[in-house]
Amino acid sequence: MAPSIRKAIGAVKDQTSIGIAKVASNMAPDLEVAIVKATSHDDDPASEKYIREILNLTSLSRGYILACVTSVSRRLSKTRDWVVALKALMLVHRLLNEGDPIFQEEILYSTRRGTRMLNMSDFRDEAHSSSWDHSAFVRTYAGYLDQRLELALFERKSGVSVNSGGNSSHHSNNDDRYGRGRDDFRSPPPRSYDYENGGGGGSDFRGDNNGYGGVPKRSRSYGDMTEMGGGGGGGGRDEKKVVTPLREMTPERIFGKMGHLQRLLDRFLSLRPTGLAKNSRMILIALYPVVRESFKLYADICEVLAVLLDKFFDMEYSDCVKAFDAYASAAKQIDELIAFYNWCKETGVARSSEYPEVQRITSKLLETLEEFVRDRAKRGKSPERKEIEAPPPVVEEEEPEPDMNEIKALPPPENYTPPPPPEPEPQPEKPQFTEDLVNLREDEVTADDQGNKFALALFAGPPGNNGKWEAFSSNGVTSAWQNPAAEPGKADWELALVETTSNLEKQTAALGGGFDNLLLNGMYDQGMVRQHVSTSQLTGGSASSVALPLPGKTNNQVLALPAPDGTVEKVNQDPFAASLTIPPPSYVQMAEMEKKQYLLSQEQQLWQQYQRDGMRGQASLAKMNTGPVPAYGMPPVNGMGPPPTGYYYNNPY
């Protein structure tokens, strides 16, 4: 259908509706005519003159309000033109913001009676081609107004005041472990608009005085409801219902309030035009007051979020879960709201300076709340608060009455100086005396103790030093024979006496006689050296040989006991010399076997000679001087010659 023909048909319909309203209206024909003119079929916004006329008529009596609700409801239910439906919804929106509060109540009462005036879920435009996007906007706009009435009804029943919650930063004394004290979700400062239509300064979206800004604004929030007296007049308008501050509400009521606000925000976000509706002037004009209301809606949501955050750490587990869900859903809605505002700024809906600074809910805050919910689930119940016991009242003691007969000491004179305390007398230092080397007076030693000390001296371990004296260090020398200062012909006690005179304070207070382990070891070593000297002269056989040379003789041999084992150590001998107790390698054993075979044969010859001539007296000893010549490299077996080097010995002669 051509636009001109459509406009003509629309004008005819409007004139017909006006004529029917003038003739058939029984209650308020002027009101119905004004409603028809305000919701005409032309594409221009409604004139401010008709809007002001409707506002004035509805403010006269409750009957006009009821007639207005009936007329607008009938207009919305019969029309199939999105322009007429959109103008009717804009009129309802204007009456909700600036009209009498009874108009809102009448809409709610009509809803209870079954007349769902704002239920336009089945609306479809049939007058325009390609008007699907416009019809979708009309349906969502009606849903937004309907949800706003639901929120108003909830606040009327519960008596909620969103902005009466006080400052959200009173939690300075609470635990800040999970980020308490955040002021990210406080309400912005109060603005000059409060869910009303139009802007300040008397200019509308078009910029002239014929739009929505010419009527003085009446600041009204959702909770600014009035109680009606029950009569048909407005006698009860001045009686306001007592509101409850948001912070004093129970968690159930706070969650109910938050649910209504979030559902209303969802309806607002769904108002974003799509398709051809983005370029429609009528839709942008209808969107302007809704965007202005969303600023206050966002502030109310931030206020509720701040209250939930303050009470979050003191709630029960079920309430914590609900609060966390509210934060999670609000985070997604705020992201969509930022995108919607950006589109509105680009399109030119309202000025950029009017938009509030929207703050996102950070993922860190959500993670913190989720962690707290998990911890609360593990505990099973909320922690019990410990009541702080009030300190007992201080009982003021009554001052005793002075006794006139009591004897009191006189106060000291003003110039009185107390005498200084006496200085402590210095204690004389005890002189340190050097004890004698042989001191038998300090500790009496019994025969048993002396015997025990002699027994302990035979062990290899050092004796325990419990006295003042300490044994002088031997520097690893365990024997007097290993001391290089010990020369042949110098007694051991002289060396010990020289060393003790220089280190007298380090000596150990021992029993009389000065028993020393080093001297004891030297005595045992002297016996070992003598044994070595005696055995070194008898090197004519192996360890098992009994053919030994006779002392003082060079050719005579006699039988003797076997040589000592390998435990006897030589003094100043090479530490890497072969040991007799450990078998040598195989290549060494071969040479040893040859030597032993030679000695065995020699020993057998000696036994044979002894059997033949040994029993006949001294005459047979002369025959023993002659013997076989030893092989080259074999040691002499007659015991003659100089003694081996490295031994300390005493000449017995």
From Swiss-Prot:
<dbReference type="InterPro" id="IPR008942">
    <property type="entry name" value="ENTH_VHS"/>
</dbReference>
<dbReference type="GO" id="GO:0005794">
    <property type="term" value="C:Golgi apparatus"/>
</dbReference>
<dbReference type="GO" id="GO:0048268">
    <property type="term" value="P:clathrin coat assembly"/>
</dbReference>
<dbReference type="GO" id="GO:0005773">
    <property type="term" value="C:vacuole"/>
</dbReference>
<dbReference type="InterPro" id="IPR013809">
    <property type="entry name" value="ENTH"/>
</dbReference>
<dbReference type="InterPro" id="IPR011417">
    <property type="entry name" value="ANTH_dom"/>
</dbReference>
<keyword id="KW-0472">Membrane</keyword>
<dbReference type="InterPro" id="IPR048050">
    <property type="entry name" value="ANTH_N_plant"/>
</dbReference>
<dbReference type="GO" id="GO:0030136">
    <property type="term" value="C:clathrin-coated vesicle"/>
</dbReference>
<feature type="compositionally biased region" description="Basic and acidic residues">
    <location>
        <begin position="376"/>
        <end position="389"/>
    </location>
</feature>
<feature type="domain" description="ENTH">
    <location>
        <begin position="23"/>
        <end position="159"/>
    </location>
</feature>
<feature type="compositionally biased region" description="Low complexity">
    <location>
        <begin position="160"/>
        <end position="171"/>
    </location>
</feature>
<dbReference type="InterPro" id="IPR014712">
    <property type="entry name" value="ANTH_dom_sf"/>
</dbReference>
<dbReference type="GO" id="GO:0005545">
    <property type="term" value="F:1-phosphatidylinositol binding"/>
</dbReference>
<keyword id="KW-0254">Endocytosis</keyword>
<dbReference type="GO" id="GO:0072583">
    <property type="term" value="P:clathrin-dependent endocytosis"/>
</dbReference>
<feature type="modified residue" description="Phosphoserine">
    <location>
        <position position="221"/>
    </location>
</feature>
<feature type="compositionally biased region" description="Pro residues">
    <location>
        <begin position="410"/>
        <end position="425"/>
    </location>
</feature>
<feature type="compositionally biased region" description="Gly residues">
    <location>
        <begin position="197"/>
        <end position="214"/>
    </location>
</feature>
<keyword id="KW-0333">Golgi apparatus</keyword>
<dbReference type="GO" id="GO:0005905">
    <property type="term" value="C:clathrin-coated pit"/>
</dbReference>
<dbReference type="InterPro" id="IPR045192">
    <property type="entry name" value="AP180-like"/>
</dbReference>
<keyword id="KW-0597">Phosphoprotein</keyword>
<keyword id="KW-0968">Cytoplasmic vesicle</keyword>
<feature type="region of interest" description="Disordered">
    <location>
        <begin position="160"/>
        <end position="240"/>
    </location>
</feature>
<feature type="compositionally biased region" description="Basic and acidic residues">
    <location>
        <begin position="172"/>
        <end position="186"/>
    </location>
</feature>
<keyword id="KW-0168">Coated pit</keyword>
<feature type="modified residue" description="Phosphothreonine">
    <location>
        <position position="244"/>
    </location>
</feature>
<dbReference type="Pfam" id="PF07651">
    <property type="entry name" value="ANTH"/>
</dbReference>
<dbReference type="GO" id="GO:0030276">
    <property type="term" value="F:clathrin binding"/>
</dbReference>
<feature type="compositionally biased region" description="Acidic residues">
    <location>
        <begin position="395"/>
        <end position="404"/>
    </location>
</feature>
<feature type="region of interest" description="Disordered">
    <location>
        <begin position="376"/>
        <end position="431"/>
    </location>
</feature>
<protein>
    <recommendedName>
        <fullName>Putative clathrin assembly protein At2g25430</fullName>
    </recommendedName>
</protein>
